[in-house]
Amino acid sequence: MKNPLKNQRAAILGSLCLAGLILFSTNAQADAQAGAATFKTKCASCHGADGKGKAALKTQDMTSAAVQNMSDAELTAITTDGKGKMPAYGKSLKPDQIQDLVAYIRSLAKK
């Protein structure tokens, strides 16, 4: 019998490796302004226009230390694969759009 946890771990590890490759690619430059546009269309309905989350939905506050202390690879993996109630965006967003989104989330810490 196959071990489902082993498969899940392999999938997570693979996603993190892919995210790391994307983040450290020399050709890729994250653009927070482009990420803001993606956030507005894909994320704001749940996380709020200001990124501070919506209490009724119990969504993450993107400005919080808990989110800001996550690595770029973690944020990329969560955006790509989803987590909990958050859907996966790996099939609907391109890797550079996800990078831009992470850059925008980082900019929210300064607001």
Predicted regions and their residues:
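Ubiquitous "structural anchor" signal
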Residues: 19-23, 28, 43, 59-61, ...
